[in-house]
Design a protein with these regions (language model features):
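Glycine-rich phosphate-binding P-loop
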Residues: 20-37
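Short His-Asn-centered micro-motif
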Residues: 21-23, 152-156, 240
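Post-Walker A helix-loop "phosphate-sensing" segment adjacent to the P-loop in P-loop NTPases
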Residues: 37-47
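PAPS-dependent sulfation machinery
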Residues: 50-151
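Conserved phosphate-donor/acceptor-positioning beta-strand/loop module used by diverse small-molecule
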Residues: 154-155, 165-190
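Flexible loop/turn segments at secondary-structure boundaries
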Residues: 158-162, 182-185, 244-247
Length: 312
């Protein structure tokens, strides 16, 4: 796959993307899933990320890869029993970009899997130019099977790499969802703990807490500075606490600000999605800060400026 993409330099520029950004566990998945109901939006399916090449040209080829991917996911859920409650993944559901970055050996996925402080520092300081060159190639390859109106993309770590994104996608737009870090940080610590338990016999939960707040505060601080260069029609802010009260209205307002068209079919799909699962806005994944040697004072100390700016 890598060689095939590397040697092909005749790709067209991909369709302009819109990126959902924000701290992990801040409502990005709910927002992403609702936006994906718009037929104008195209996101990679999980099976496409895991088994892209050679391109699946027939329905039979796609079904085989879906089956293979679902089999792999069943194994993953056996290894990480709480994965289903933390983050729903299926072969045919839209998926975020983090697995693409793993191919470039620059992904926060690896810091979830193991206690690797040197690697965390590497992620904070290394260039991500090659990550997004590869990222762009990936979507160019997907477009060989058809170009969408717009790419809908998501990855929590994108918040720390806005200049690199804009270098490859100069017309990119962003939807930044904000949630109180005292809630989102605890949730990501719990996710990290459950992933790491699959790879380590012993884990240090206090170390997980320290690593998580340091790494994500670094990314967020960088992102908040970098986004100052964006115009008002390039980025929209959403408060999670308000969004969950009326997701559809917030999405309609977001479309207006980004000059996207909202049709009645998309409105109906979003409403149906929300009505079909009345528990969608209720967390099944339980966690507390003190499990990870943290308290609200620690979070407020690390994220002080951000929390003041967004009234948390």
């Amino acid at each position: 796959m890598l060689n095939e993409l590397h040697e092909n330099n005749n790709f067209d520029q991909p369709a302009d993307p819109v990126f959902v950004i924000g701290l992990p566990r801040s409502g990005t998945s709910l927002l992403f899933n609702l936006l994906s109901l718009d037929i104008a939006h195209r996101s990679p399916m999980y099976w496409e990320i895991m088994h892209l090449m050679p391109l699946a040209k027939t329905q039979t080829a796609r079904k085989r890869r879906e089956f293979k991917t679902n089999t792999e996911l069943k194994l993953a859920k056996t290894i990480i029993p709480k994965l289903r409650a933390i983050h729903t993944i299926r072969a045919t559901t839209p998926e975020e970009c983090q697995q693409i970055a793993t191919m470039n050996i620059r992904s926060f996925v690896y810091m979830c899997m193991a206690d690797v402080p040197e690697y965390v520092e590497y992620l904070k300081n290394t260039s991500f130019d090659s990550v997004f060159k590869w990222h762009k190639k990936f979507y160019q390859a997907l477009e060989l099977n058809g170009k969408p109106t717009r790419w809908l993309l998501k990855d929590p770590s994108h918040i720390g790499h806005l200049p690199q994104i804009l270098k490859e996608y100069p017309n990119a737009k962003f939807i930044h969802i904000h949630r109180d870090p005292t809630e989102s940080v605890a949730s990501f610590c719990s996710l990290t703990k459950n992933v790491r338990l699959a790879f380590s016999k012993k884990i240090d939960t206090d170390d997980i807490g320290k690593t998580v707040i340091d790494f994500w505060n670094h990314n967020l601080t960088k992102g908040m500075e970098d986004r100052k260069s964006l115009s008002s029609d390039q980025i929209v802010d959403i408060q999670y606490s308000e969004f969950v009260k009326n997701p559809l209205d917030h999405i309609k307002n977001t479309y207006q600000q980004l000059n996207f068209d909202m049709n009645i079919q998309t409105e109906n799909k979003i409403q149906k999605y929300l009505e079909q699962d009345k528990n969608i806005l209720k967390a099944e994944h339980r966690y507390t800060l003190d499990e990870f040697g943290l308290n609200q004072k620690d979070i407020k100390g690390q994220f002080k400026e951000y929390m003041l700016n967004y009234d948390f």
